[in-house]
Each structure stands twice: as structure tokens, then as C-alpha cells.
Amino acid sequence: MWSEHVTLEYPYHFEEVLKRLSFDPLNVIQLDEKVIYVPLCIDEEQIVVRLQGIGTVQNPQFWISSQTGDPEKVMKRMRAIFHWNEPFQDIQNHFLNTSLRPLFETYAYTPIILEFDHFACLLRCIIHQQINLKFATVLTEQFVKRYGTEKNGVFFFPTPEIVANISIEELREQKFSQRKAEYIVGLGRSIASGTLNLASIETKAEEEVSAQLLPIRGIGTWTVQNFLMFGLGRKNMFPKADIGIQRAVQGVFQLDDKPDDAFLEKVKQECEPYCSYAALYLWKSIE
């Protein structure tokens, strides 16, 4: 077993992180102890990492421990997932001078948390397309518990190779639509065959990521934007077509009707170069 202690030099709202992550029944969280167990797959090894917050918003500190895994590689991934690589003060100061200031006062120093796995991020995006959040959450949980693996009470998403071999009929029996079942299996096959290499696009420009993902059935602009935001941690994404974003903007600005594209574009420009944080806090405002 190994463990590491991390102290951040800037404010960080870990309680808000755990609160949002607790909406997903697949996440193993102990809110009272400020603990989450993170499933990581590094070099084809499944690793359960225990993360505990032991500090405050103004003085954030963490204990990270695991029974397995290369500590250096695990810590590199944990820093990326939980946004420990970049101070928030510049982001916070930027939004305190925008029309979204009230949101950034309410949810101050809440980071964007990445999906624990790139393939899982794309799978989740496809499952969540065009259905309500509650049903999407149920479908995702059932899917992972049926095809994924469990280690120490923590569930790991299935690998692309496993998903590639699921039959469409089997997914249809689990209330997936015909088209969505085809998208899920097709994505697994694209990665398993080497047609799509998710590791290779981590550092590529947004246009290059889009060029590789959009030809795959079931992946459109909304999915690419969400993957860039929650899979790769890009800071300047603002999915204007997202219904939740539209509802949130309508509420924040007290509009009679949903905002049109011109209004959303104006909000987006005001938020640059940190649009992803605006999107996150807008979503939080309607949770």
C-alpha cells in the first residue's frame, strides 16, 4: 500500500465536488468522511484509489492511497481528473467581472472533474443523448454493473473489447433503442480495432479531436463538446445546443423564453477563455 499527501496553494471546494459526484450511483462516496473511491485503469491494470479531503475550502488538503498501481502514474492522473494542476484565482477573478458573477459567488472554487476514463466518458455521452437524466443514469448503472467489473466494491466500466462483443439484441432487452445500441457497440469496435485511439487525441487541438470523433456513428457536436470538457479537460467549451444550458441561462437572466443563439453567443463571448466553467456552474444552478 502507498499513500501521498497533497496540499493546494489555492481555494478548492471539495465538498461541492463530492456533492455533484454523489448524484451518480456508480460512484462510491462517503460524504461524512469526505472520501471517494476512484476507479482508474492504467497500463491495463485496474486500480482503486482512495481520496479523502482533510482540509477546508481555503486550505485544501488530501490523502490519496491505494493498494496497487504505480504511485507516480496514479498521481498524475488524479491531478488531471481533480484539477489540481491550475490555480482557480484567475478563473474566479474573470467571472466576478461578468454577468455570471452571482453563480461564481455561490459555487466559488468548484472545479470541473473529469470522467475517470476516456472510453467511459464517450459511452456515458452516447447513453445520455436525447433522454432525461434520471433514465440515462439508470441505463448507465445497469450497463456498467452488467458488463463492467467490480473490485473492492468499486465498479469499472467495461473495456472496448467487451463492448464490441455485446449483441444489439441484448442491449435492446435492456431498454436501449436500436440506434443507441448500435452506437454503443460500434464505438467499442472502433476502439478495439484500433480505428480510434483515444490516448492519441489527448493533446490534439479541438478541431483535430472533432475530425477523429465525428465520423463515428452516434457522435455529434454535443458529444464531442462534452468529451472535450469532461474527458480531456478543455477549458473553453460552451455547448449552446444543450437544453440544460439553455434552461439555466433563461433562469439566470430571467428571460420569458429560452435564449436564442445570438443571446447564448453573447454569454459565451463574455465567458471566454473559461467557458467550460460557465457551463458547469450553469448546470449546477438547475440541479
Model-derived features: positions:
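HhH-family (HhH-GPD) DNA N-glycosylase catalytic core used in base-excision repair
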Residues: 1-287
